[in-house]
């Protein structure tokens, strides 16, 4: 049943953290939850070309700290910080203006190993009517060059305009969904084509996280030196 549950929600509190970190009583919780939703929708809509990977929100009294993980920090920051200032003003207007907003931009270290960015890339290519097999193969090759331990890509819908919808998936390497200490990055995106909506799901296995230790490196097989064969010596008996 490992495929029936969200891999990130399954590991919350073990190897994954919540994307919104704050506390509220039962009277203010719905309001703050709606604010988080508005913040995420506003950022994703206005920075759709910046390669947004993750948005984390923290709250302290009337202060909201927003951490944006992006593949293109220059697009978010803008010239002289004008982009961040415009984003902050827009968010304050959207939330009513009574919140103090601070924005921190974090660059994604490995773009080709991020499940969200891989899913967005595949969805964009499918909307341009590129063959799904070619797109998936390219995405997997790029992820392998980024040295991930394993990746699984699933595409569902009317693939290549087929009359009957189907689901196809490709996996390279290990993707242990039942292992709780496994660092699984998951993302889901939809591609709107002229034939209908295609669903794209990405699982990326980045290694195992053991408490108190660094990320476990895969065991390398011990290499034994090859024995050199001695060349046989033949006696010269031609004169006998």
Curated annotation (Swiss-Prot):
UniProt record, GO biological process: translation
GO MF, one example: rRNA binding
InterPro entries on file: KH_dom, KH_dom-like_a/b, KH_dom_type_2, KH_sf_prok-type, Ribosomal_S3_C_sf, Ribosomal_uS3_bac-typ, Ribosomal_uS3_C, Ribosomal_uS3_CS
Keyword set, alphabetical order: Ribonucleoprotein, Ribosomal protein, RNA-binding, rRNA-binding
Domain of life: Bacteria
Residue span of region Disordered: 214-240
SUPFAM superfamilies, alphabetized: Prokaryotic type KH domain (KH-domain type II), Ribosomal protein S3 C-terminal domain
Domain spans labelled KH type-2: 39-109
Record's GO cellular component terms: cytosolic small ribosomal subunit
CDD domains linked to this entry: KH-II_30S_S3 (cd02412)
SMART domains on file: KH
Keyword presence, RNA-binding: yes
Protein's UniProt keywords contain Ribonucleoprotein: yes
Subunit structure: Part of the 30S ribosomal subunit. Forms a tight complex with proteins S10 and S14.
Free-text function comment from the UniProt entry: Binds the lower part of the 30S subunit head. Binds mRNA in the 70S ribosome, positioning it for translation.
Protein family: Belongs to the universal ribosomal protein uS3 family.
Protein name as annotated: Small ribosomal subunit protein uS3
Organism: Gloeothece citriformis (strain PCC 7424)
Gene: rpsC
């Amino acid at each position: 049943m490992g495929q029936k549950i969200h891999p990130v929600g399954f590991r919350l509190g073990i190897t994954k953290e919540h994307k919104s970190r704050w506390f509220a009583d039962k009277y203010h919780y719905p309001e703050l939850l709606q604010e988080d939703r508005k913040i995420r929708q506003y950022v994703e809509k206005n920075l759709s070309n910046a390669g947004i990977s993750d948005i984390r929100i923290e709250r302290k009294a009337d202060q909201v700290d927003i951490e944006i993980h992006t593949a293109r920090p220059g697009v978010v920051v803008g010239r002289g910080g004008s982009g961040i200032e415009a984003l902050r003003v827009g968010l304050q207007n959207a939330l009513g203006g009574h919140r103090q907003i601070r924005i921190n931009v974090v660059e994604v270290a490995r773009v080709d190993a991020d499940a969200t960015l891989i899913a967005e890339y595949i969805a964009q290519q499918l909307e341009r009517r590129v063959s799904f097999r070619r797109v998936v193969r390219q995405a997997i090759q790029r992820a392998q060059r980024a040295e991930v331990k394993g990746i699984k890509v699933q595409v569902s819908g009317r693939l290549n305009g087929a009359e009957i919808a189907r689901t196809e998936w490709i996996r390279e390497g290990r993707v242990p969904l039942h292992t709780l200490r496994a660092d699984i990055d998951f993302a889901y995106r939809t591609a709107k084509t002229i034939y209908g909506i295609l669903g794209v799901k990405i699982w990326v296995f980045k290694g195992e996280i053991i408490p108190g230790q660094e990320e476990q490196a895969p065991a390398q097989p011990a290499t034994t030196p090859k024995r050199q064969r001695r060349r046989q010596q033949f006696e010269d008996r031609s004169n006998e």
